[in-house]
Every structure is written in structure tokens, then in C-alpha cells.
Design a protein with these regions (language model features):
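Electropositive nucleic-acid engagement tracts
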Residues: 1-16, 21
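Functionally engaged cysteine thiol sites
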Residues: 33
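Single, function-defining residue in the core of a domain
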Residues: 12-16, 23, 27-30, 41-322
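Extracellular beta-strand-rich solenoid/capping regions of secreted or surface-exposed proteins
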Residues: 36-38
Length: 322
């Protein structure tokens, strides 16, 4: 509720966007007793994370200690908590009939990229006329799978292939006709926002601690970093909202610089300010209080400094003798 009061933009009007993806913790050389005779490094586990890109918040996650379990199975308990009015974005790994049936049971919508071994099609409708978009052209058709279940299949033909060499992408969706095929294709492009969130978790908050070999400890470290990220995202939004009128368009606060500011001053505040000087603030007044405090921050100290594009340097030959 607090971050919504601080203002936010929406990717798809009148819809709550949820991006779901798995985050596998890297293998670690920290050996548990049962693995000390094994050569390979152990994988502590993984988490399936539900991310709200509009609010920049992790909404839910399912932690799994078995690093080799299926993400498709672990996502089902998360889908049980989905609600009508939400649209879930997922990669092709989740293009399975149980995942789509779980969405139908809770009356939530989805946009899932098609994989090679997708559920067998019972019937395919005619393709509609292609419509040009920024990155290529889009067309759609109605498909039917086992059990009489129907959904829309959208094909995006790209002007230039992706890094993996794909020249066309297909998405399955049960969004209503009020959401066009162009909007579905554009919406899926924003699925990569969760990858940026994972990168910030690891680089800024050290969510993947290499010395933790125990699955419980490693997953506790990851979930603690997720909780800290949500708090920093609220602080980031409050700083941006407080200085929006005085800063140029596109100005953003940096979660990294905010984390540095919190880390550098926290111990001193614990010593200088006893607990009675830090009273509890009601939830309904928290957003206003955060804005009051954010106005005291110098924007330059927490401004985001995006790196410009790399300019390729010409390679020249050096004349030499053996």
C-alpha cells in the first residue's frame, strides 16, 4: 500500500502485471559432510520468484532446497495465490498444460512464450492479417488444446533475429480481445525486467553467498536479500517522487547508492538515537513520512549514473620483428 501511494506507472492499464522466473543459486565449493567425497560442486537450491515490475517489488516466492527439482512444479503453489485482474508473464519453460490450467482455475490471465515441445494442439484457427510494430510484425490465431481449452497464439516476426538466432517468437495468452496482439507482444518484452532485478539482488545485496553450502542457509540469505530489496525499492520510489519537480525527466535514484547511504549511517544512528526517538509510524502515514525525509536528501548523492554505450575501438596492426 505504501509504494502505491508514492506513484507508479502501469505496463498494461487496468491490469496487475506479474513476472515469474526461477533463480538458481550458483554451485559452491563449500562441502557438506555428505558431499566431501564428490568431485562436483554442490548447488544449494533455487527459488521461483513473482515480481511486480510496476511497483518494483517481489510479491511472492517459492524456495526449493532440491536444486534439480522442476520449476514447472514449484510455480503451481504460487499460481494458486493469483487473482483475477492479473496477467502473468513467463518464459517458454512454463508453457505447459498444468500451468495454464492453474491460471484458468483462479481466473487469472497469462502470456507465455511457446516452446518447441508445447502442449499438443487439437485445432488451429486461421491466422489474422499481420500488423506492423516497432520490432517487426504481429499476427494471431485461436488454438485449442486437450480438454477443449482455447487461447490466443501471437506470432512476432522480428526485423532482426535475437542473440540466440530466433527470427520469430510465439506467445500463448488468454487475455481478452480488448488487449490487442500488439500489446501482448510489447508486454512480453518487459519480461526481462525480472532479470535486471536478479542482477541488482546479486551485485548490490549479495543474494548469492558463495560460502553457504547448506540449502537452508543459502536460501535464507537469498530471501533476506529479497526483503531488503523491497525496502530499498520503496526508499528509491520515495526519493524520486520527492525530487521529481526539481530534477530533469528520466532522473532516477540508484538502489546501490541508497544501500551505501543506509549502510554507512546505520551504526552511528543506532548509537546516537535511542529507540524512543524512533517511534512506530502507522501504515497510512508512512508514505507521507518517507516523502518528508526524502526531501532532505541531496539528489546528487543518490543519482543513478547509467553507463553509456561502449564504442568499439579499431584494432590496428603493430609492426614488429621476431
Amino acid at each position: 500500500p505504501t509504494i502505491k501511494e508514492l506513484g507508479c506507472t502501469t505496463m498494461l492499464p487496468d491490469w496487475q502485471v506479474r513476472v515469474v522466473d526461477g533463480n538458481h543459486l550458483a554451485s559452491t565449493e563449500k562441502r557438506l559432510g555428505a558431499l566431501r567425497q564428490e568431485r562436483g560442486a554442490a548447488r544449494p537450491g533455487f527459488s521461483v520468484v513473482v515480481y511486480d515490475p510496476d511497483l518494483d517489488q517481489v510479491i511472492d516466492l517459492q524456495a526449493c532446497e532440491d536444486a534439480y527439482a522442476s520449476e514447472r512444479v514449484c510455480v503451481l503453489p504460487l499460481l494458486a495465490n493469483a487473482e483475477p485482474g492479473q496477467v502473468w508473464l513467463a518464459d517458454r519453460l512454463y508453457c505447459t498444460l498444468p500451468v495454464m490450467e492453474a491460471c484458468e482455475q483462479v481466473q487469472t490471465s497469462f502470456v507465455i512464450r511457446q516452446q518447441a515441445k508445447h502442449p499438443r494442439l487439437i485445432q488451429e484457427g486461421e491466422w489474422q492479417e499481420s500488423v506492423p510494430v516497432e520490432t517487426g510484425s504481429v499476427r494471431e490465431q485461436i488454438i485449442q488444446v486437450r480438454g477443449g481449452y482455447q487461447c490466443r497464439r501471437v506470432e512476432l516476426t522480428l526485423h532482426s533475429p535475437t542473440d540466440s538466432g530466433d527470427s520469430s517468437l510465439m506467445f500463448w495468452s488468454n487475455l481478452p480481445e480488448s488487449v490487442s496482439a500488439q500489446q501482448i507482444a510489447e508486454l512480453y518484452r518487459r519480461r526481462w525486467s525480472i532479470e535486471g532485478m536478479f542482477q541488482r539482488l546479486e551485485a548490490i545485496l549479495e543474494s548469492e553467498i558463495e560460502t553457504l553450502g547448506s540449502p537452508k542457509a543459502a536460501l535464507l540469505g537469498f530471501t533476506t536479500a529479497v526483503l531488503a530489496y523491497n525496502v530499498l525499492a520503496v526508499l528509491k520510489r520515495s526519493v524520486e517522487q520527492a525530487h521529481r519537480e526539481t530534477q530533469p525527466d528520466g532522473w532516477e535514484a540508484s538502489i546501490y547508492h541508497l544501500a551505501v547511504q543506509v549502510r554507512s549511517g546505520y551504526e552511528g544512528m543506532q548509537i546516537a538515537l535511542p529507540s524512543e526517538y524512533l517511534p512506530a509510524i502507522p501504515v497510512e502515514k508512512l508514505a507521507q513520512r518517507l516523502l518528508e525525509l526524502a526531501r532532505n536528501i541531496q539528489p546528487k548523492q543518490v543519482a543513478k549514473s547509467p553507463r553509456g554505450p561502449k564504442v568499439p575501438k579499431p584494432k590496428t596492426w603493430v609492426q614488429g620483428k621476431a
